[in-house]
From Swiss-Prot:
Residues 887-904, 978-991, 1054-1067 have a biased composition (Pro residues). Belongs to the HAP2/GCS1 family. Changing D367A: No effect on expression at the cell surface. No effect on ability to mediate gamete fusion. It is found in: Cell membrane; Cell projection; Cytoplasmic vesicle membrane. This is Hapless 2. Disulfide bonds join C33-C44, C136-C164, C147-C210, C165-C383, C167-C190, C366-C390, C475-C482, C515-C556. InterPro entries: HAP2/GCS1, HAP2/GCS1_dom. During fertilization, required on male (minus) gametes for their fusion with female (plus) gametes. Required for membrane fusion, but not for the initial adhesion between gametes. Inserts (via its extracellular domain) into lipid membranes (in vitro). Probably initiates the fusion of gamete cell membranes by inserting its extracellular domain into the cell membrane of a female gamete. It comes from Chlamydomonas reinhardtii (Chlamydomonas smithii). GO terms for cellular component: cell projection membrane; cytoplasmic vesicle; cytoplasmic vesicle membrane; plasma membrane. Residues 241-272, 770-789 have a biased composition (Low complexity). The gene is HAP2.
Amino acid sequence: MCRAIAVALIVYLAQHYILAHAEVIASGRLEKCVVDGVTEELDCQEKVVVTLTVGNGQSLQTEALEFSLSCLNSPDGRCPCSCSAADPTCACRDLAAPLRVSLTKSPLWASYPLQYLSSFNWKPLEVILRPSNKVCKDGDWEDSPTCGWFSQGGVRVADSQGFCCECSSSQVWDDTFGSSKERTRANLDCDFWSDPLDILIGRKPVSAHCLTFDPQWYSGYELGAASLQFEIAITVEVPTAPSPTTATTSATPRTNNSSSANSTNSTNSPAPQFLSPPAPSTREVLHLGPSVPLASSASRLLSAKLLGDLAMYTQLPAISNQVLMVPQPPAAAAATGSPLDATLATNRSAWMLLDKTMLSMDGLACDKVGTGFSAFRYQPSGCGRAPQACLSGQLKDLWEADLARIADGRVPLYMITRFTGGSDTTLQSFSGGPLSFALPVTSHSQSLVTLSVAADGVRLVTNRSPGKITGAAVCRFAGTSCGGFEAVAARGYIYVNITNTGRLDSDYTLTVSNCSSNVRPIEARTLAVRAGSAASLDPPMELYVEDQAAAAARTCTVSLYDSVGAVTDSLTLSFYTNATQLVVKPSGGYNGTGDGAGVKRNGTDCSTACTNPIDVLCFVTKKCWSKFGRLLGIIGGALVGLGLLAVALKFGWLASLAASCCGGGGGAAAGGAGGGMGLGTGGGGGCFGGGQQQQQLPPAASHAMSPPQQQQRSHAEVAAGAAVAGAGAAGAAAAVLGAKHGGGGGGARGKQQHADTRHLQDRDSRAIDGGASIGSSSAGGSSSLSSYSQPREAGGRLLQPPAAAVFVPEGGGGGAAGDEGARAQSSDWDARGRSPRVADEHGSPRQRYDGVRQSPYMVSANPYDGWYDGGSGGGGGGGGGGYGREAPPPQGPPPHPVGAPPPPPRRRSLWERMWLQRPGGGGGGGGGGGGGGGGGSGGGVDQHGGRSCADAARRGGGGPGGMRGVEGLMSNGGRPNGPHPHAPPPPPPPQQQQQQQRQRRSFLESLTAMMTLPWGGGREEEAGGDRRGGGRGGAAAAHGGRGAGGGRGHPPSIGSPPPGPLQPPEYGPQGGQARRWGAGGGRGGVGGDGGGGGVGAAAYVQLSTGGRGGGGGGGRGRGGGREGPTWHNPVYDWQAPPK
């Protein structure tokens, strides 16, 4: 029953007392029982339970609840008291006045907890220095940089030394010629003429940029979640005087302005109610709040409980996780002991509230609060920016921006006074600590409180007093100006003053309604005003409009309601709004629409559009730059390769590696001389060719030789005390590949005859059994390392090997001499008509080697060339062909003084070195039968020379070998068909020549020489000579070339002086001049031996021991001497000076 009454009362009060500040939600009598668990008896009491609301604007005791009590402490629970008050043992007392309870509520605050983050400077500044000595130091390891170091706890702060800027070369150029449009951070004068001397020596204008701090610092505190803070005070007044015995009501009623609501029901018409007369009483105040929601009076007559708050109309500001900036006390105040709390508590208007995105907690970001040394030092393009760049957006900048907004009538963005309308007094009224932060809550907030009182009944008494609106205005933030504001960009603040014109403290409700269009509704506010006093809204009401238009007159009605909801005063409030001032848009720049983004090309488009890899026009038109670049790369690579090839040829790197075939045939008693090293001539007449075996002379003839003759012979021999047969000359061109050599002489098939009886021998096709070989010519070809370490004389020059000579392997054996009267049959030729395979049993042809293409079978110019019998002059066992460059024959003897030392060497020209060597001529033909005819010389580069030699030998006379071959001699010592038949022989050179200066190899040449494998031997050629091959072995000896033993085709008669040199002692590999060598060899017998092969050169031009000649005797030659290498070093190629 009681619950039903309470619900009906709540509905009634909600409909009729919605504007009341302390509204009773429910009230009724209720028997409350308590069980303590000690006993099963219930402690029950009948109480009046009242649930009411308390608003946040109810700060004065303008309402009171009066609980009627007949007596107190009645022993039997009945009133009036059954005992007498005069009885000292009677505790029951009848009350003269009701129990009075009033409730008030403090202002409501939204409090935010604080958490310290860091300290932030008020305004970091840049200091610019211009060192007088134009030296700026900003290194990380500088002890004394120009800006100095900051320290923190005795440790240097990284990057606190600032940075330096100087004029660049381009800035000096631009400033000098007046075309500079760029700035420098310190506005440096980069003109060259400002200080030309210093700029010339590299001391350009320079500036140092240092970071310093303002003395004022702020502490940053992060805001936590908001909580509501308020306090409800319950004042309980208990009367102490007993009630009078007379009537409870006075005969003369007193009326007042208070209203009363009685919770007791009566069937009779309500009697007039009067305010209870004041009576002596005791006062007790109970406090309720979110922290302590329960309280009871000392007499246990009343208990109170805070149930909670109803929802507000306006939410709290969403500023959690923002940072509150609180100024720190100055250092002077801290040093004097000024308390921080007092400083902060009296300076809350300087507090600022910032979002975290505006801060740099680590100091690495520019233009943010907290910018540090690293951000300042490493700012992008620091030297090209304006001074103080990277230092904007600091606390001072934000504060000044807020002041500018306030001056324009706008609300600040960072000051915390934006929540109070610019009033600082509201912030100071918060009762929290000095580092507490709370914002006032102006929205309606109703707290539910339940009171339980042991009373018979209750009534609510509310003060009602008239009020008046004394003033109202719409102003801008902080009241800078009134009358209106800027629409949307700002908001208006309604300031209202009211006065309580009654005699009681009363509550009032202020509303703003009936506004013009597009004015946002405004929430009502409540005030408690003392009797006869005036009050103002603090903070003021906020007024928003919802358009950007300018309006001269907008209106709203301001009404004042009293405590019971009656309008006690109202007025019309007029204001204006200005149009919103939008940010000015930038103008200028490009006014067109542009061409838009292009279509991206990929590799697939180019591959389908340009299929020709060399279609340059397609590449350019289709913009296939990758393919165009690829083509340019290929062409460029080829050109670079050709350039490197030219350089290699110029310096002899490639030419010294180019293989050439210089036969190593043997110059033996019966065969032609060995092939040379390929500097120009053919085998028998090869330059530096194989040695020609010396003819053993009778003792008388030997003793009859004059000293010049013996000295002439000694030029070709260096081995002490040894009659060296077939001594070969080392190749003149210094090949970096190491030793390449020809073959030595092969074994004899017939016995060699004496020179005096050689012409008596029959010229048949059988082999003549002869005697032993002459001298040391019986063994195969060989070479010795010791011979390389000795100076050798060749061509009138004294050569000296380098200190570290490359070992030259032993020379190969030369081929055996051919028989008399033998001729090649048609079956000896292969199916393709090529010459018979050379080296029947002894030689091993090589398929090919680098630099020279050579087939296993040499091709003769005439496929039917063969051997001739001894009578006709069979082909001698000539050496392999040279590998040289064709040159025209000389026209006359060279004008060189007789007996003079050879001219100094010179390098060949680039054109000469770039021209690849061509194959040299064939080997020399064999001598005529019976020794009657002189042997032909080795062939030159043309094929005619070798053949003519063979033909001449068959006819019994020698013939010229070729352009550069030494002529063979006829039996009478003549030189048929020679280049200079009438040239007088020059005297022999002196025995001692001045040693040429040694030329050391480069590292590349030495490395190549050590790492290159030796080349294999070559192969013979037929008697006709041809380009590379040597001739076949013949019956008679021939002068097969210019070996060390080269000379006459047959020895002179005993006692006759030896012939002189055939040509002047000049060396000209490109001029085709004959070279001068030692004394001529003896004539070979019928069916003589194969000649010993000449050895190849080492790394430099030097002589070496030639291959040894074979044994004497006739018989068909089984194989010629092996070919020597064709390498030569064009860098060290000697050539006669230009004529």
